[in-house]
Amino acid sequence: MATTTRLTIEDFEKLPDEAVKHRELVDGELIDVSGNTGEHNELKDLIISLLRPLVRGNKLGRALTEQEYDFRGNVHGPDVSFFGLEKCELYNRKRRVQRFVPDLAAEIVSQNDTFESLMKKAQRYRDCGTAEVWIFSIETRQAYLMSDSRNVILDEDQEFRPETIPGFSIRLGELFDRI
């Protein structure tokens, strides 16, 4: 019976970029994740372009795309993430995997994602200390928000106001209309 060696985050970081592209580390194993479509990338880029000026201008912390984090030994790179000033001193630009979790993780539903797998990932984010998780569905033009105070599905006619980034607000339909 063959034994499988489980990878650590340190092992993951030593792998060449091409070996980990479109992969995450889950329970010691490399898991393939689907590549992004054009509209997926456009929504990700739009969200970060709206967040960054607010985050930087108000000195709230950092807003990043596809930054990988350590979720208790698992490596995930949310499409968009944010962490506040108190975590900025932990941020190491030269490190592939940050040794903390973001305050906010946003995922955009990809064509190969299942609801079950996304909810499992979102719950892992929350269980590891991420305060707020956003899941955007381009197909249904909805967003699902998870936090301590609410778990809610927003439709395109509703205002999107996250708790983790004060001052950010946009009608969800307007967000989808801009891609």
PLM region descriptions:
Residues M1-I179:
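Gly/Pro/Ser/Thr-rich low-complexity, intrinsically disordered segments predominantly at protein N-termini
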